[in-house]
Structure formats: structure tokens, C-alpha cells
Amino acid sequence: MLSAQLNDYLAEVGLTATEQQKKQLVDFVGMLNKWNKAFNLTSVRDPEQMLIRHIMDSLVVSPHLKGSRFIDVGTGPGLPGIPLAILNPDKEFVLLDSLGKRIRFQKQVQFELGINNISSIESRVEAYQPKDLFDGVLSRAFASIQDMLHWCHHLPKADGCFYALKGQLSEEEMSQMPAGFVVTDTIELKVPKLDEQRHLLRVIKQD
């Protein structure tokens, strides 16, 4: 059932995946549903809704990624990082979260599904000082873009960018962009079966 729905959703948004990648995505939903009962990893309880609200909501960002090394900040159970890592085996994803139960879940996913391009790190973002900086900083966890830029400003390379996954955009929030940052792209995302606004903002640092 989920496999057929995933095929339809991928076709609807013009994304391609191998049979192995599709199996990994469906198995990820299965693991999320199983662990969620004990560890409360997401408020979404229904696997079909997980496929839409977590898997597809993450994957629609994939065509807009530039670079090869990314960090997903406040990743929770691995969203959007794990679905994006499955679809982009040539890119590297660091998944950052401060809660141990989420990191344990991610590591179990990595082990059971054989995902080799993710690293899970338990840390608060302000305490995390990476040896190598990132092409892209991803997050759908922050309440505001201002918060994201404040807490994550030290993570991208000089020519890297921030990818803020947002729902409805507020003009007030957009007008309060911190000094030294500029929005280069505002992309409306279409998620199958989701009648809610979704946007991706790309933000860069300016000297």
C-alpha cells in the first residue's frame, strides 16, 4: 500500500528513485511508526500521513540542494535529513539534535536500512563546532528564520547557504531579516495530498 502511494507521489512531483531507495523510504516510515509508539518522535501517528507529511515533505526539497555536504539542524527523528540522504547517496548529511532518544533512533535507522551517508550527532547547535563547514544548513525545526540564522550562523562555508523549510510565509518575518543575510530564493513547494502552504527559503550571508 505505502509502496504504491510512494510511487504515485514521486511521479507527481517528478522525482525518481531506485527500487532500493523506495524500499528504504517505506521501511523508514515503518521504523518511525514502530518507535513512535514508545518514544513519541512525532505527533503524526498514521503511516500514510507520515509518508506525506514527513517523507514527501522532505523529498520535495531535493532538487533545490546545491553542494555535497549538508547539516540538518534540529532534525528530530531525521527529518528532512534521512529521506534526503536516501534519495541523494552522493551527498553527505550530518543530523544534529539535542535529544538522545532521537539520535538513538537515527542510528538504528542507519544500521537497519544500510544508509552510509549520514552521521548523527547529539548536541545543541550553539555548542557544535564542526571541523569542516557545510555547503548547506537545513532546518524545518525553527519557529522563525531569525532564530535559525542566529543559532546556525557559524555552520555554512563562506559560499554556503541556509535552507529554511517553512509553511505559510509571514511578511513580518520576511521583513525582519537580520543584517548581513539576504534571501536569494523563495520557492513554493507542492507536496502531494497536502493542502497546506510549503515554502523553501534560500538565504546567504553577505559580507
Curated annotation (Swiss-Prot):
Domain of life: Bacteria
Subcellular location: Cytoplasm
Keywords of this entry: Cytoplasm, Methyltransferase, rRNA processing, S-adenosyl-L-methionine, Transferase
Annotated EC: 2.1.1.170
InterPro entries in alphabetical order: rRNA_ssu_MeTfrase_G (IPR003682), SAM-dependent_MTases_sf (IPR029063)
Enzyme's top EC category: transferase
Broad class of where this protein is predominantly found: cytoplasm
Key word Transferase present: yes
Binding-site list for S-adenosyl-L-methionine: G74, L79, V125, E126, R140
GO molecular function: rRNA (guanine-N7-)-methyltransferase activity
Catalytic reactions of this protein: guanosine(527) in 16S rRNA + S-adenosyl-L-methionine = N(7)-methylguanosine(527) in 16S rRNA + S-adenosyl-L-homocysteine
GO cellular component, one term: cytosol
NCBIfam families to which the protein is assigned, alphabetical: rsmG_gidB
UniProt function note: Specifically methylates the N7 position of guanine in position 527 of 16S rRNA.
Family: Belongs to the methyltransferase superfamily. RNA methyltransferase RsmG family.
Name of the protein this chain belongs to: Ribosomal RNA small subunit methyltransferase G
Gene: rsmG
